Design a protein with these regions (language model features):
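Conserved AMP-binding/adenylation subdomain of ANL enzymes
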Residues: 148-165, 172-275, 279-283
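Conserved ATP-binding loop and adjacent catalytic segment of the adenylate-forming AMP-binding
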Residues: 193-196, 273-276, 295-302, 307-346
Length: 346
């Protein structure tokens, strides 16, 4: 892999995914992150051809897709497989690659580091493809400076102390997960974890609650559908505790809604009288809900679709505000967001 080469990543989110992309950047290569939802017949084949991909990092679960179309990709020279699975000709195990890299660096470290140091702001970092719902997908080219600038802009709105942890639940192929999921964490010296991959997508989803309790994240990325599922889980758990607890929970929500109002006017005017009741409900109910998220969760960052105001009020009431970001891939992607200091959910 040489500077300027395009290398795809087709894998479920994992630490190895992040390490692979950072390794590509050090080598001066261009990352082409791809969604695991792509089917090989059209969508995947088009992207690999259009981007002129020379190598691909692929998980063992996605490998069959590559095998079925490899004969149609004469430019594809290397297939690096994440996970343990019997390999075919022309495929290299991720573990083998790591050993080869260690051996190479033991003799050529300075020469290799010069490649990364020579990268310029306007050099391409990633090519991210749009969905292509009305025509062929478009490759959005983002430079290294696009990413670093958006990281700086994001950190002007939200403080990330070095002790913060996050668990990335969303797919890593989108630049939202890149910037808000791990690049701002790297910039601040904070910690990133990824969900334990299951044999099926459903098994991976089932790992999320346990992984949250293990990691004890300080913030989580979300999309409205995921936030709604979390809320359904919370309300289902409350109902299971009986009518009294359910009634108390709804009274607590109404009180918190009245106290918080639209967020920015929290506790204003006569609402200050509700503060002791909100504190009581927090101690009795809401704190226990937060413990199910690991006990350290400060906020969510939402994106990807319109976030319902009622959903924002709900999470603000239980003590885990959900900040709504807006952006687009071409903007790397964050354009605007509310934040702890500027929170309004009208």
């Amino acid at each position: 892999i040489r500077p300027g080469d395009k290398v795809a990543i087709l894998a479920e989110g994992s630490n190895a995914w992040i390490i692979s992309e950072l390794g590509l950047f050090y080598a001066g290569a261009i990352s082409v992150p791809l969604s695991v939802k792509l089917e090989e017949s059209n969508d995947l084949l088009f992207r690999l051809r259009h981007a002129e991909v020379k190598a691909v990092f692929v998980s063992k679960y996605q490998l069959p897709k590559i095998r079925r179309i490899r004969a149609e990709l004469p430019q594809l020279e290397q297939v690096i497989v994440l996970g343990h699975i019997p390999l075919e000709s022309g495929e290299t195990a991720y573990g083998t690659l790591k050993r080869l890299v260690r051996d190479y660096l033991s003799k050529n470290r300075e020469e290799f580091l010069k490649i990364g140091q020579a990268i310029q702001n306007d050099d391409y970092a990633t090519i991210t493809y749009t969905s292509g719902t009305t025509s062929d997908p478009k490759g959005v080219i983002l430079t290294h400076r696009n990413y670093t600038a958006n990281v700086e802009q994001a950190l002007s709105r939200v403080d990330i102390p070095p002790y913060y942890r996050t668990l990335i639940i969303l797919p890593l192929d989108h630049c939202f997960a890149h910037v808000v999921g791990f690049y701002i964490m790297i910039a601040c010296g904070a910690s990133v974890a990824t969900v334990q991959i299951g044999a099926t997508p459903m098994e991976t989803l089932k790992n999320i609650p346990q992984n949250i309790r293990e990691v004890k994240p300080h913030f989580l990325l979300s999309v409205p559908a995921l936030a709604k599922n979390f809320r359904k889980g919370i309300e289902s758990s409350i109902r299971a505790k009986g009518k009294f607890t359910e009634g108390l929970f709804h009274r607590a929500l109404r009180t918190a809604y009245a106290y918080n109002r639209d967020g920015y006017s929290k506790g204003s005017g006569w609402r200050i009288l509700l503060k002791p009741f909100v504190a009581l409900f927090d101690a009795v109910l809401f704190r226990k809900i937060r413990e199910a998220f690991g006990g350290s969760l400060k906020f969510f960052v939402g994106g990807g679709a319109l976030l319902d105001a009622e959903l924002q009020r709900f999470y603000y009431a239980i003590g885990i505000p959900m900040f709504q970001g807006y952006g687009l891939s071409e903007a790397t992607p964050v354009i605007s967001t509310n934040s702890p200091k500027y929170h309004w959910h009208r």
